[in-house]
């Protein structure tokens, strides 16, 4: 069942221009082991928005909250099921403001930007999956999907 209608909007639209990205999907990057010299090369699986601690994160589209809690690397995290196999994930939050089982509307505040998990500073990391495959969230901001 499709739970959204219309376009997806930036989850950082409450505080940032839609092009205020600090790291884009697919960028090569090195993950830093906090407190160690560990460096792991990898593929960036989401879209990072700059921003200060405590700024509002909003739902890019309507959906059902299927996870809200802490993850080791991702920190405080929220996952929304938008239906039709489309899921959004929001990592590193300073505070989660929704609960599992809650239906959220587009633009609803779901959490606050933070620096939890494995990070070098406060930011919003947004991931998007379609039928279990990670895709570039930016595509969903600039195109309309059925």
Name each region found by the language model.
Residues 1-13:
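Extracytoplasmic and endomembrane cell-envelope/extracellular-matrix remodeling and assembly machinery
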Residues 15-146:
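Catalytic cores of peptidoglycan-degrading enzymes
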């Amino acid at each position: 069942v499709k739970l959204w209608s219309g376009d997806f909007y930036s989850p950082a639209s409450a505080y940032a221009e839609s092009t205020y990205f600090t790291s884009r999907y697919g960028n090569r990057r090195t993950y830093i082991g906090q407190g160690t010299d560990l460096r792991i090369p990898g593929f960036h699986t989401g879209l990072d928005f700059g921003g200060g601690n405590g700024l509002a994160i909003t739902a890019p589209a309507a959906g059902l909250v299927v996870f809200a809690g802490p993850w080791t690397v991702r920190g405080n995290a929220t996952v929304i099921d938008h239906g039709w196999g489309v899921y959004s994930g929001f990592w590193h939050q300073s505070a989660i403001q929704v609960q599992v089982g809650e239906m959220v509307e587009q633009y609803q505040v779901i959490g606050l930007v933070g620096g939890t998990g494995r990070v070098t500073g406060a930011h919003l990391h947004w991931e998007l999956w379609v039928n279990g495959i990670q895709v570039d969230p930016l595509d969903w901001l600039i195109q309309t999907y059925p």
